[in-house]
């Protein structure tokens, strides 16, 4: 039996009465976000709007993005990454569970020195994928060119944010490379591994 979204008590500063809000709204008010699903346009737009709203509300208090995602749509993930770089507050990224594919790209986009992985978290990087089998020949060529541009952009960001040479990133993106939390720290994707 599903329990739905739990409700928790919340009292706004200066108000005497406590109201019950769903847990996600309560966490958003504390500047905590969760990417706990495949990255798509809907979750991307939700996270972007929350980051922008809260950065306007208070631009000096950090935002926290908890990630447990298998990846998803590249463009939607890049939009989240770009917003993280655009907003004034630092965005701390915390990997819990899995940050794979474009989710690892979002993870590496956190504020330098403020990217964390839980001890048993896993990180996976690889090159962007496509649905070539559905395309006609002309579309296939255009899609391949676009995919190559996206791969170059993603590679440059990983190089910049991890400090790894371009040849290492390019080689590792040829296949699925899974890392433990400590391996992701050594690689430069995260800065700290949370202690148990």
Curated annotation (Swiss-Prot):
Keywords: Chloroplast, Hydrolase, Plastid, Protease, Serine protease. GO terms for biological process: protein quality control for misfolded or incompletely synthesized proteins. One of its GO terms (cellular component) is endopeptidase Clp complex. The keyword Cytoplasm does not apply. It is found in: Plastid, Chloroplast stroma. PROSITE patterns: CLP_PROTEASE_HIS. Mostly expressed in leaves. Also detected in stems, and to a lower extent, in roots (at protein level). This is Chloroplastic ATP-dependent Clp protease proteolytic subunit 1. It comes from Arabidopsis thaliana.
């Amino acid at each position: 039996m599903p329990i739905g979204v739990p409700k928790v008590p919340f009292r706004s500063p200066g108000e005497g009465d406590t109201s019950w809000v769903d847990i996600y709204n309560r966490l958003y008010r504390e500047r905590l976000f969760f990417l706990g699903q495949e990255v798509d346009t809907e979750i991307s737009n939700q996270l972007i709007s929350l980051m922008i709203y809260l950065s306007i509300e208070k631009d000096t208090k950090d935002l926290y993005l908890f990630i447990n995602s298998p990846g998803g749509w590249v463009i939607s993930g890049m939009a989240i990454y770009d917003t993280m770089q655009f907003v004034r507050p630092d965005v701390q990224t915390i990997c819990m569970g899995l940050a794979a594919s474009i989710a690892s790209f979002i993870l590496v986009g956190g504020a330098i020195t403020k990217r964390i992985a839980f001890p048993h978290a896993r990180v996976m990087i690889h090159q962007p994928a496509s649905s070539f089998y559905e395309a006609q020949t002309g579309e296939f060529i255009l899609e391949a060119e676009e995919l190559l541009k996206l791969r170059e952009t993603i590679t440059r960001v990983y190089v910049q944010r991890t400090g790894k040479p371009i040849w290492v990133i390019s080689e590792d993106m040829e296949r699925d490379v899974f890392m433990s939390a400590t391996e992701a720290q050594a690689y430069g994707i995260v800065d700290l591994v949370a202690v148990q």
